[in-house]
């Protein structure tokens, strides 16, 4: 037949497997160049795109103003934001950010997120950034939908848990223009801490 290959000779049938094993044996004793990932973790690049983080102002107020631009920019539709109004009303008013609004509900679905960073570019207040944390695997799908409490940056010394009034300026413009100094740490039981 015109299309069938010629049968291999006994010599070719003998040497072909030995040549293949020769490649295996030659590389078996060379130095390993792969990273042994679960056991040896190497640092990521400084601008690595990992898990998201919602940032805070130096007094502890949230930078997110609930504008939903990050959700609109997301090509994977992985971000859900619900905004609400801040209030300085003495009768039960709460302030979570210096702006008129804040992100009451903030969710990122890491089952859908492609870690592209378009949400970071869209954020007008630099409230959303990406950390170097990349181990997001989980055995439960529900745990991969991160809520606002999972995404908020931790409180540093001198910060106060919102809701509380603006401490760094008289209006939101002072926050956005950077016309403030870092707040002094409050002593336990002080009037500013008790009033919050």
From Swiss-Prot:
Keywords: 4Fe-4S, Cell membrane, Iron, Iron-sulfur, Membrane, Metal-binding, NAD, Quinone, Repeat, Translocase, Ubiquinone
Superkingdom classification of source: Bacteria
Start and end residues of each 4Fe-4S ferredoxin-type domain: 54-84, 104-133
Residues binding [4Fe-4S] cluster 2: 74, 113, 116, 119
Co-factor remark: Binds 2 [4Fe-4S] clusters per subunit.
Annotated EC: 7.1.1.-
Membrane topology recorded in Swiss-Prot or TrEMBL: Peripheral membrane protein
GO terms under cellular component: plasma membrane
Compartment(s): Cell membrane
Gene Ontology molecular function: any one: NADH:ubiquinone reductase (non-electrogenic) activity
Catalytic activity: a quinone + NADH + 5 H(+)(in) = a quinol + NAD(+) + 4 H(+)(out)
Any one biological process term the GO annotation gives: aerobic respiration
EC supergroup of this enzyme: translocase
Disulphide bridges, residue numbers: none
Cofactor(s) needed by this chain: [4Fe-4S] cluster
Binding residues annotated for [4Fe-4S] cluster 1, in chain numbering: 64, 67, 70, 123
Primary localisation category: membrane
Quaternary structure, from the entry: NDH-1 is composed of 14 different subunits. Subunits NuoA, H, J, K, L, M, N constitute the membrane sector of the complex.
Its job: NDH-1 shuttles electrons from NADH, via FMN and iron-sulfur (Fe-S) centers, to quinones in the respiratory chain. The immediate electron acceptor for the enzyme in this species is believed to be ubiquinone. Couples the redox reaction to proton translocation (for every two electrons transferred, four hydrogen ions are translocated across the cytoplasmic membrane), and thus conserves the redox energy in a proton gradient.
Family assignment from sequence similarity: Belongs to the complex I 23 kDa subunit family.
Protein name: NADH-quinone oxidoreductase subunit I
Gene: nuoI
């Amino acid at each position: 037949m015109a299309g069938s290959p010629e049968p291999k000779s006994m010599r070719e049938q003998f040497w072909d497997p030995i040549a293949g094993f020769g490649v295996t044996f030659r590389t078996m004793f060379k130095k390993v160049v792969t990273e042994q990932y679960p056991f040896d973790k190497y640092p990521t690049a400084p601008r690595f795109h990992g898990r998201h983080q919602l940032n805070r102002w130096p007094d502890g107020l949230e930078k997110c103003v609930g504008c939903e631009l990050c959700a609109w920019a997301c090509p994977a539709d992985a971000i859900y934001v619900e905004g609400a109004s801040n209030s300085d009303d003495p009768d039960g008013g709460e302030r979570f950010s210096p702006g008129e609004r804040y992100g009451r509900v903030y969710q990122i679905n890491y089952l859908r997120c492609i870690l592209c960073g378009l949400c970071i570019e869209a954020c007008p207040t630099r409230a959303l950034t990406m950390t170097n944390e990349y181990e997001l695997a989980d055995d439960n799908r529900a745990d991969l939908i991160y809520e606002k409490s999972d995404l908020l940056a931790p409180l540093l010394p001198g910060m106060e848990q919102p809701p509380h009034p603006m401490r760094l300026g008289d209006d939101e413009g002072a926050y956005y223009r950077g016309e403030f100094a870092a707040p002094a740490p409050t002593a336990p039981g002080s009037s500013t801490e008790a009033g919050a």
